[in-house]
Amino acid sequence: MDVKTVLIFTVLFGVISNNAAETGIESDSHDALNIGRMFCKPLDQQCNKDLHCCKPLKCRRSNNGRKYCKP
């Protein structure tokens, strides 16, 4: 691979991994950019049928009506 190809892959992968690294409710707008089930949500992050929790966590409804990843 030449330098240009490596650079393109680096930029693309950097954008994807940056979205995965963001946490908190503010990151919800970025969730659509995540590719399928490739990324899972860690403990206490919001989840739904499209945003799965990391195993062995489960998506559970909390007191405020939202769903969060819990053991």
Swiss-Prot record:
Disulfide bonds join 40-54, 47-59, 53-69. Expressed by the venom gland. GO terms for cellular component: extracellular region. The keyword Disulfide bond applies. Residues 1-21 form the signal peptide. Residues 22-37 form a propeptide. The keyword Iron does not apply. One of its GO terms (molecular function) is toxin activity. Keywords: Disulfide bond, Ion channel impairing toxin, Secreted, Signal, Toxin. Its main location: secreted. It is found in: Secreted. Probable ion channel inhibitor. The presence of a 'disulfide through disulfide knot' structurally defines this protein as a knottin. This is U11-hexatoxin-Hi1a.
